[in-house]
């Protein structure tokens, strides 16, 4: 009996010592489940949902309306020697691109546009949603609050995506040839430094921030007016209401911000260092007159209006499907 008791006590002691080790090993064997749970929790976060909805809506609108952006860029960068005495419009540029670069030439710059718009629109909607939840606590924004929220969200997205915007503009102009988006970023950084990757950022923010602020204000106020007292509105009509309000808001916001867009395009295409907004604006005025600040206004208004209207329509529908209030 005495001999057999010793091994039993040793086994109990060993079991006591081993249990923490076993538990530690067991927890180490199940990290994948913990990771899956963490990922699932993150994916269920409302801000992540808003980001995903915005990214998907941005992808759809970019694929459809990229040709309008290319035509806008080409119109804004026409030189007087290219135009001659006659006036060149969107149709003339469209026919020239199709004739010299084929129909697919209208989608030149598609890669940087997708790289820019997919995360860019996602960042915008994600920032906008989180800002609304934090500052407004679910209350509908006033006109001034809409302007501030729109401008702030667009500024965050604009700064994050500025290098890709520069590459996209140069692709679309036809004046630069890069092998890929990465090669373009590397070439710009090597030849122009980090400043080259953010060329035209101020003009971009002066264009995009007011556009988004005004757009959100017009969109929110128009939508609230249309839906006022219409609680029984058929759900099938909501996409049409959202799209119509988006078109109206886009036209107004595009007209106000067109000059800043022209200045931005010229700055991003220039390789001259330390060229400020005033210098570019003066050059445009001397070369093209006041009309030069509205070159490409038709394709830009069409593109921005339709893109924003479609993006918001898809975003609103997807957020509603996920049970979230946009």
Swiss-Prot record:
Pfam families cross-referenced by the UniProt entry: Mito_carr
Q: Show me the Solcar repeat boundaries.
A: 45-134, 141-225, 237-321
Q: Which UniProt keywords apply?
A: Membrane, Mitochondrion, Mitochondrion inner membrane, Repeat, Transmembrane, Transmembrane helix, Transport
InterPro entries from the xrefs? Hem25/SLC25A38 (IPR030847), Mit_carrier (IPR002067), Mitochondrial_sb/sol_carrier (IPR018108), Mt_carrier_dom_sf (IPR023395)
Q: Which GO terms describe its biological process?
A: erythrocyte differentiation; glycine import into mitochondrion
Enumerate the transmembrane spans: 51-76, 109-135, 147-172, 200-223, 241-267, 296-314
- MF (Gene Ontology): glycine transmembrane transporter activity
| Localization of this protein | Mitochondrion inner membrane
The protein's annotated catalytic reaction(s) are: glycine(in) = glycine(out)
PROSITE patterns the UniProt entry points to: SOLCAR
Give the Gene3D superfamilies listed for this entry: Mitochondrial carrier domain
Where mainly found? mitochondrion
HAMAP family membership: SLC25A38
Main role?
Mitochondrial glycine transporter that imports glycine into the mitochondrial matrix. Plays an important role in providing glycine for the first enzymatic step in heme biosynthesis, the condensation of glycine with succinyl-CoA to produce 5-aminolevulinate (ALA) in the mitochondrial matrix. Required during erythropoiesis. Plays a role as pro-apoptotic protein that induces caspase-dependent apoptosis.
Q: Which family does it belong to?
A: Belongs to the mitochondrial carrier (TC 2.A.29) family. SLC25A38 subfamily.
Q: What name does the UniProt record give this protein?
A: Mitochondrial glycine transporter
Kindly list the organism's lineage: Eukaryota, Metazoa, Chordata, Craniata, Vertebrata
